[in-house]
């Protein structure tokens, strides 16, 4: 009789499948950004037409496209823009939009409020990039829409569509982190092709900033050479940078134009200057962007001849910089009726200030522990041990000097430990303050002074570093006017690296003696 076979051990169970991408995230409801970059076959159909919905859904998930696809989109859009006139002419019905500033998820909300670009005519007044952290997504999406709807979606240039500001603020850094410097340079070439103004329905002049003392007629705009980096002064600069005077409609001065002290360049224009321009060019009003508005828009004093607001400002970036708490708005003009549609901000993914990575962000935590260990190691030796060791090898004077040197080293490391401790304990305040400065740098001496210095960073120190004026991290910004006042320093034209900064102000006499500056008959009309 055969012996019974021993029971065989059951095979080990197969290893569990790896968790899905992003399953280990702290906030499970937030999906992990796709790692796959869209290819040409995914973005363009067989006829080379962009699949805008595919691109939109991918960008909303924080996805990216192949670099060559990004370059193709930017260059094809730029080719269309180059064929347009410096002052384009558009007809109603149309939806006019103000600043976007890299707030891509709010741009998606804008199209929900304003209507699908497939059946709605749009005019954007510039400032698509900088300050927000999704600027390249805004450019790619708007440029694809321009390729799809070249005769119904129009894009003007803002003061931020230039090399000078995008290098100083965030757009260049964003392009290099998400794509490459090639993509950034392609964007700059495309920005040089953007028209400067639009004539809406033969009734409204639409522009990013406003008027210039060197522009008297619409033909003066048509003659401008726009295919270049905007200069620090002159009519092209003024179209992008000028503002209505702070007492617009209630001026005490008779001067139509005065130096723009807020921007550090260009001019303030007043109510009589606007009325004179409107009358000379048979227009109803000027529609512009360039300034944040609490309600998303502002209607200025009415013209005495037409009874219509002489000037309208529209701003389409809600909760600007995540601190303004403002509404955004778009202007819909149809059948000689103007409607304002407001909307609030939408949730968006979080980026550390200035695109900081997690390793840089965690450095204060690591640094505090390392310096703490160094302080403890150096603090082991007592004063008696230092003096005893010194007596064996040196005279009393040398021992005292050596003791002082070691004490200085301990104090230096202790100071470094305090800096890292402040960085760790006040990390949120530090990141907030750095994120609100265009250079990403803290005022000198803030960290070394400890927590109290950080919490009471002075107006003078912050101004010296071009940070938000008077910002104190523990202080919560409570109103739109407060946020706008604190951010005022960032509204100025930044200093130029390659030349002495022009004050931007030419006297009117100088302006009139250089009438040909910034103009040329060889530009697109």
From Swiss-Prot:
Disruption phenotype: Knockout mice show reduced body weight, independent of changes in muscle weight. Reduced slow and intermediate program type muscle fibers in the biceps, triceps and soleus. Increased expression of fast program type muscle fibers in the soleus muscle. GO terms for molecular function: calcium ion binding; calcium-dependent protein serine/threonine phosphatase activity; calmodulin binding; calmodulin-dependent protein phosphatase activity; enzyme binding; protein dimerization activity; protein phosphatase 2B binding; protein serine/threonine phosphatase activity. It is an enzyme of class 3 (hydrolase). Residues 475-497 are annotated as: Autoinhibitory domain. The lineage of its organism: Eukaryota, Metazoa, Chordata, Craniata, Vertebrata. This is Serine/threonine-protein phosphatase 2B catalytic subunit beta isoform. Calcium-dependent, calmodulin-stimulated protein phosphatase which plays an essential role in the transduction of intracellular Ca(2+)-mediated signals. Dephosphorylates TFEB in response to lysosomal Ca(2+) release, resulting in TFEB nuclear translocation and stimulation of lysosomal biogenesis. Dephosphorylates and activates transcription factor NFATC1. Dephosphorylates and inactivates transcription factor ELK1. Dephosphorylates DARPP32. Negatively regulates MAP3K14/NIK signaling via inhibition of nuclear translocation of the transcription factors RELA and RELB. Residues 9-21 have a biased composition (Pro residues). It holds the Pfam family Metallophos. Residues 65-356 are annotated as: Catalytic. GO terms for biological process: calcineurin-mediated signaling; calcineurin-NFAT signaling cascade; calcium-ion regulated exocytosis; heart development; locomotion involved in locomotory behavior; lymphangiogenesis; negative regulation of calcium ion import across plasma membrane; negative regulation of signaling. Its EC number is 3.1.3.16. The gene is Ppp3cb. Keywords: Acetylation, Calmodulin-binding, Cytoplasm, Hydrolase, Iron, Metal-binding, Phosphoprotein, Protein phosphatase, Zinc. Residues 417-424 are annotated as: Autoinhibitory segment. Signal peptide: none annotated.
